[in-house]
Amino acid sequence: MSETTQGPTHFRLMSKLKAIGPYLREPQSQEGRYYFDCLSVCVDDKKSPEKREFWGWWMDLESIEGGFTAKYHIGKYNKEGKWVSEALPQKVVEEVYFTQSTFHQKLIDTLAEHFKLEVEYHTESFDFA
């Protein structure tokens, strides 16, 4: 974007990012930096809801010239409500990768359609390939 072109406001971006799905975490987001996560697979659904842990991913979306970089991580969302970087068990890899891929395509499409902005993977992002 040129210096004379104004990008979308934080509030317009938040509105469109929220519409993608339940992934945006508003309290952890701020102008120019947006936080997303996805609890893809429950570790043990026999436990009571407040003690459940999940396999999934989280991502920091950071504003750069002309768009955003997406830095993804994978791991476990523990019962304390914190993400822990951890290798996924083989039985959940397909589902976690699917939720990330589906979300990422929606993110790309939304930012391109509404704001003509691009999304690229951060150099330190987890590689879902």
Curated annotation (Swiss-Prot):
GO terms for biological process: positive regulation of DNA-templated transcription. Pfam families: Crl (PF07417). Its main location: cytoplasm. The keyword Transcription applies. GO terms for cellular component: cytoplasm. It comes from the Bacteria. Keywords: Activator, Cytoplasm, Transcription, Transcription regulation. Residues 99-123 are annotated as: Essential for activity. It is found in: Cytoplasm. Belongs to the Crl family. Binds to the sigma-S subunit of RNA polymerase, activating expression of sigma-S-regulated genes. Stimulates RNA polymerase holoenzyme formation and may bind to several other sigma factors, such as sigma-70 and sigma-32. This is Sigma factor-binding protein Crl. It comes from Vibrio parahaemolyticus serotype O3:K6 (strain RIMD 2210633).
